């Protein structure tokens, strides 16, 4: 019957449908959920070493002594919803215990923390299907720079923000209210910039900055929405607490880390698909511009 015949899509939604098909094809081909599971496992293995190294860096700089407390609160309240307080208390105990380790054990912690950065590098290059390899020395330098300079830059930005908020002339001029509004969306801005840098710098192929900006924005928005949705799910449907009791924090943390990596990798897939869609449109335009064979 004519009702069941395939209808032509409206021209206004054709680009979106085509882009969606390309994206779904890439996500299925790359095995996004499997890659996210791999990164979630490595993240849980590297979590304590990574936190230990980061806060050891803050301890080495007295200027960051007050900022480290603010940074802990910011990370656990904005990036680990619902169970953030419980996870924070456990991690602080683990970090305190790691301070008693020998030099060999400390080197092991650093290597484990670098393992996470190396895994992220490998997975993103898998998504970009890049076969280019960086020299080992250069890769180690990049990983070490991310591990050391990244936390210090975040700490410096928070120190500057705290200093500006403490100035009297800002409070009198009414700029404080504007700064408060900016600070409310600061987690989204920070996620957006972080994802953009991740998509631009880590792949060993050239990534158009505009494409990475769009993919990072989608990932940042999904991350914020996912954070609120996950916190709502944990509070409204406390099945994990009922089943696991005190140990509920373990599956909750694993589920959140896995969901976070799914969002990050989806942003990477969107970034790649934007370039593929551009090439698809260009090839289609070239085919339409060529005259039929009978008219040659």
Curated annotation (Swiss-Prot):
UniProt keyword Transmembrane helix present: yes
Keyword Chloroplast tagged: no
InterPro entries: UPF0761_bac (IPR023679), Virul_fac_BrkB (IPR017039)
GO cellular component: plasma membrane
Keywords from the UniProt entry: Cell inner membrane, Cell membrane, Membrane, Transmembrane, Transmembrane helix
Annotated compartments: Cell inner membrane
Membrane topology type: Multi-pass membrane protein
Transmembrane feature ranges: 44-64, 67-87, 104-124, 136-156, 185-205, 212-232, 246-266
Signal peptide bounds: none
HAMAP family associated with the record: UPF0761 (MF_00672)
Similarity field: Belongs to the UPF0761 family.
Name the UniProt record assigns to this protein: UPF0761 membrane protein Spro_4878
Species of provenance: Serratia proteamaculans (strain 568)
